[in-house]
Amino acid sequence: MNLHEYQAKQLFAEFGLPIPEGYACDTPQEAFEAAGRISTAKKVVKCQVHAGGRGKAGGVELHDTKEGVKEFAQKWLGKNLVTYQTDANGQPVTKILVEEASNIANELYLGAVVDRATRKVVFMASTEGGVEIEKVAEETPELIHKAAIDPLVGPQAYQGRELAFKLGLQGDQIKQFVKIFMGLGEMFTQYDLALLEINPLVITGEGNLLCLDGKINIDSNALYRQPKLREMHDPSQEDKREAHAAQWELNYVALDGNVGCMVNGAGLAMGTMDIVNLHGGKPANFLDVGGGATKERVAEAFKIILSDDNVKAVLVNIFGGIVRCDMIAEGIIGAVKEVGVSVPVVVRLEGTNADLGRKVLAESGLDIIAAESLTDAAQKVVAAAEGK
């Protein structure tokens, strides 16, 4: 689960990290009043969406007057912001962050992520702030400095000092950096984060450190024990189909193809998408119904797939291990009858009760195309999607 910038900064403040004075606003009038409370001559106004590239898309501006701030809010609130990280429809803007402009002398990068290779939280720091860390890693990897956090003892002050030295910080800046580093380390584990970034972490003209931007991603598997963070969830930033799928414990990712896919198991789902591509098709989604699929979940999966108007055919690929193929077949039949499927449906069943599942489908009287193998299924669904 992602957080907005203003929410990330709320957590930063909770751990004593330095942030600019700012206010999250829901209406143009609130933005106007917030601008009046900020003492700096210039105000920064930012659209709050779960995507990067806001500045280049016009979603971040600098204004001298309260009226300018209000006009910006009027322009964007209720609209969609399209950036290079969104799809063509963009992300809806429901909040505007109004904050004081900062006197920036230098920009740094500080982030943390779970490193699966070392099984530790790894902090990354760089003097190349304000740009994408992926670009820095590709072009100048020697400018990224790392510190791995031992899960038994947590972040240590000496690690923060080492990073500060490598960033060229001096005097009181080192103390400030260590405080930020220690606070982020505590926050990462306490709130079950998967990723956090401060980009940029700036050095102001007065020589102080300031968290100018914030990005936080929370491990969704841990949300059950993070009620405070659950309340920060913004469903407006999610694909409606993905949000619906999550309610039914379905793993769904919308894509831009025309072949709907329903599979049990993430690996098989990825393999199914690959073989559809191999035979000239384009998957419309990734959908894993999981090992504990029920008839109800299968029916909901069908509804979600068919809610995409681009879907011209559906491929159901089930390997019966934990889940029984006959139960999946009953779910398919129920969904087809309930939803009124008007596109071709290709079904490949293998494993537990596969023969019984195929028999159930054959006796249903529905126009369902049976496939003997994965290759056969891919060829048939691609042909069906093309109207052949």
From Swiss-Prot:
Per UniProt, where does ATP bind?
Answer: K46, G53, R54, G55, E99, S102, E107
| UniProt KW keywords | ATP-binding, Ligase, Magnesium, Metal-binding, Nucleotide-binding, Tricarboxylic acid cycle
Which cofactors, if any, are listed as required? Mg(2+)
Catalytic reaction annotation:
succinate + ATP + CoA = succinyl-CoA + ADP + phosphate; GTP + succinate + CoA = succinyl-CoA + GDP + phosphate
Q: Which GO terms describe its molecular function?
A: ATP binding; magnesium ion binding; succinate-CoA ligase (ADP-forming) activity; succinate-CoA ligase (GDP-forming) activity
Give residues annotated as binding substrate: N264, G321, I322, V323
InterPro entries for the chain: ATP-grasp, ATP-grasp_succ-CoA_synth-type, ATP_grasp_subdomain_1, Succ-CoA_synthase_bsu_CS, SUCC_ACL_C, Succ_CoA_ligase-like_bsu, Succinyl-CoA_synth-like
Amino acids binding Mg(2+): N199, D213
State the Gene Ontology BP annotations. Answer: succinyl-CoA metabolic process; tricarboxylic acid cycle
The pathway is: Carbohydrate metabolism; tricarboxylic acid cycle; succinate from succinyl-CoA (ligase route): step 1/1
GO cellular component term of the entry, any = succinate-CoA ligase complex
Q: Which residues form the ATP-grasp domain?
A: 9-244
Q: What is its EC number?
A: 6.2.1.5
Co-factor binding comment: Binds 1 Mg(2+) ion per subunit.
Query: What is the recorded function of this protein according to its Swiss-Prot or TrEMBL entry?
Result: Succinyl-CoA synthetase functions in the citric acid cycle (TCA), coupling the hydrolysis of succinyl-CoA to the synthesis of either ATP or GTP and thus represents the only step of substrate-level phosphorylation in the TCA. The beta subunit provides nucleotide specificity of the enzyme and binds the substrate succinate, while the binding sites for coenzyme A and phosphate are found in the alpha subunit.
How the protein assembles, per its UniProt entry? Heterotetramer of two alpha and two beta subunits.
Family label: Belongs to the succinate/malate CoA ligase beta subunit family.
Extract the PANTHER family matched here: SUCCINATE--COA LIGASE [GDP-FORMING] SUBUNIT BETA, MITOCHONDRIAL, SUCCINYL-COA SYNTHETASE BETA CHAIN
The identity of this protein, by name, is: Succinate--CoA ligase [ADP-forming] subunit beta
State the organism of origin. Answer: Vibrio vulnificus (strain YJ016)
The lineage, from the top, is:
Bacteria, Pseudomonadati, Pseudomonadota, Gammaproteobacteria, Vibrionales
Give the gene symbol. sucC
